[in-house]
């Protein structure tokens, strides 16, 4: 069962990669809502986007990703794996979300954003690194504590009679 749950986590990570790839398909400015306010402001100043487009893309991203990811993990854990009760649901949700979080931190943030030009926005190179050490600390903290909280909330919701 553990291997299956890890594979489901890899599947969720693949969905994350797909969302990111679609988001930057016409250039990284398409996902500038994930960047710092300084980068966003520079993009607006350079005429690459507007504050309205940034807000719109952020809302679309949240409206698609959050429900999509929640649906994915719930279908995997309760629909496919048949988890019963809080504990079974919690550990499976936590593993799936943690695997995705590791992929996000190491592969997306660490490699794709940090070591390739795919996420470079022309005219903002002087603002690199786009993900600062402080940002990384916050993401790791949320990724560990936050995913546990999300797993607990979802598991509790699924066990309420």
PLM feature spans:
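Membrane-proximal helix-loop-helix units in multi-pass membrane proteins
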Residues: 86-92, 103-124
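Hydrophobic alpha-helical membrane-embedded segments
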Residues: 6-30, 96-112
